[in-house]
Amino acid sequence: MKMNLKKKIIALAVLPALILGIASIVIALTTVKDSLIDEIQDSLQGTAAAALAAYDQNSGEYMMAENGDVWKGSYNISKSENLVDNIKSKSGMDVTFFYGKTRIMTSAMDDDGNRILASEAGDKIIKTVLEGGEEYFSKAVSLDGNLNYGYYMPVYQKGSTSEIIGMIFVGTDKSRKDAAINKIIWMIIISVILVMVLCVLASVLVSISISRSLREGIGIVQTVAKAVSYTHLRAHET
């Protein structure tokens, strides 16, 4: 009976700490991760908007010359290495300009140090951005075999709200971002576990103390009860 009471008290004290700890870990694995990915998306979107503004500030329409170069007025987008490289150096993100569905300028390099050009966007990107006119965030864009978080933004012809001539893409290395996210999540989980262990230990100690006090109280009551019973018995005998 005494052991059962002790176990019940410990369980009542420890259970809330365990539930709170588990709930905190679940939140860290879901809500916190989603929030961090949302921050990545917002950062990519902001950089894409800045890159698009840098191209759009040039007067004139987007057009392709006979030699295949793409221009915005008098600005040669196909030769805009300095612009995309400068954005990458400041933001840490790769920038790509698509004319139609084809990459014509990018800061992204392959393993040989060459720019990743002339490749085409995937069907889903074409349908969503080029045909649908929607911005698109992806958690897994492959650039020469390397996965990136990526953001696509449609590019409209000058003065038009319906003619889409291409896309701006901004990407950041997925493995590095995931490593940073996982580091934050593990720090939260470890902190929660440490606090949970301390709470459990404190709860056990308090529970043991309460159980001991209850046993002592019960013992005193039983002693008093026996004394009273004995007194009544003696009085009855006399």
PLM region spans:
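Extreme N-terminal signal-anchor transmembrane helix of membrane signaling/transducer proteins, especially
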Residues: 5-31, 190-193
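Juxtamembrane membrane-water interface segments immediately C-terminal to a transmembrane helix
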Residues: 29-53
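Short N-terminal helix-loop-first-beta-strand/juxtamembrane motif that initiates sensory/input modules
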Residues: 46, 50, 57, 84-104
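Extracytoplasmic/periplasmic sensor domains and loops in membrane signaling proteins
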Residues: 78-92, 107-143
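A short beta-strand signature within small-molecule sensing/ligand-binding domains used
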Residues: 135-137, 145-154
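Helix-start (N-cap) segments at beta->loop->alpha junctions
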Residues: 145, 156-159, 169-181, 185-186
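Glycine-rich acetyl-CoA-binding "A-motif" of GNAT/NAT acetyltransferases
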Residues: 164
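Polar/charged heptad-repeat coiled-coil helices used as signal-transmission/dimerization stalks
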Residues: 175, 179-186, 208-234
